[in-house]
């Protein structure tokens, strides 16, 4: 099965210069936990911001989320796949990079959606492979220096 058959196609983004407070509010209203990050200079996706990025890289360090911007704490580089890739390729990328979401690109390398662990769970992926991906991305990474 192709990625385009299981991905979430409604894609919303946020600019690197958007405050973390505004980004968190946007996530709350949309009931989502991540957004692609777009550069205001060239309108290209340059990273992802997650609710976890905001908490771990800003709130936990005592930063002011009203003045700190998305570009300061976003995850980069991006982990991507193409909409015509097999679903297994997306799961392999998630496992290798230890991410829960992968940006989906079209044949012109333009973002067209996201594929998440939840999308994989609803697709035809082998249960053993799904378990392997979940275990891998859920294993704690080495702690960052304070």
Residue ranges, per PLM feature:
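Short N-terminal leader segment in a subset of presequences, especially plant chloroplast
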Residues: 8-17, 43
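The conserved cystathionine-beta-synthase
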Residues: 13-31, 38, 81-98, 104-106, ...
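Tandem CBS (Bateman) regulatory domains
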Residues: 1-10, 50-80, 85-95, 111-146
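A glycine-centered beta-loop-beta connector
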Residues: 27, 35-53, 94, 102-118
